[in-house]
Every structure is written in C-alpha cells, then in structure tokens.
Amino acid sequence: DAVRWHFIGHLQSNKVKYIAGFVHMIHTVDSLKLLQEINKQAAKHQRIIPCLLQLHIAREETKYGLSFEEAAEIINDPKVVGLKNVRIIGLMGMATNTENEIAVQHEFVSLKHFFDRMREQHPELTVLSMGMSGDYKLALSAGSTMVRIGSTIFGERTYPSAT
C-alpha cells in the first residue's frame, strides 16, 4: 500500500478492467460513458475510485477532454450522483505546448475560474490538476493544487529509434 498508482494517460473504456483493481486515481475521465465504465469495474473490486474530469483547455486538437459545458453537465447529472463506485474529486487540464506564457497562463486561469464556479455547488471538488514539468510554475500561480512533473523528476522520456 506504499505506492499509489495514478493513471494519467488517455483511457479507453475497454481498458478500464485492467486497472480498476489497483489504481488509486484516474486523472483523465473525458466522457460520461468512461465514468460509467469505471464505476462498473470498480464495483467488481468493491472499490471507490477517485476521478478527475479532463477538460480540453489547449488550442491543440491532439489533446483530449471535455468542454466546460460538457463537464458541467456531467458534474450536475443526477445519474452521476447514483454512481457509487466513483467519486469526481476535481478537474484536470493540460495547456497548449507553447513558449507563449501569456497564452498558457490564460488557459490555466480560465480553468481555475471554471473550477471555482463548479466548487460553489460541489464542495467535494478539491483537486485542480494543471501544470507539467514545463509549465508547473504558471499553473501553481493560477491556483493548481496538483502538478505532473515526471520529466523533472525522472528526466525526459527516451524512445528507441526505429531500425
């Protein structure tokens, strides 16, 4: 129990069964369908899995996530309240991968404002995850409560070259 596995990558519904028995938190819930599947698989293991809704705040189409409107619909959906084996405890967003700090700061601030609005009605939302190794200082200044800094800790990823 000393290690807490956080799932931070894109998660397909058909892969949830492989992590539901041990994952501590899932950071990348980007649909109601995925949330329902996490609930179903967590129930099989008699667990409650904390989740973050992933919001699409970047200007890059390669990133996944919900719009603010879609996230609000899920947070306020009575069906979600009935899901007994998942808990939405916050929001996660990744900013555009750019050197333009003003643009990145704007994306983080807009997510923080949305988080604050949602939290007024849903005080159980306590985690705002934004910021990675390259932009975590901007994220913290905007109000992030959780950062992902694996590259800073472990070094940049190296991929084997194709031969």
Regions found by a protein language model. Name each.
Residues 1-134, 142:
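Conserved alpha/beta-domain cores
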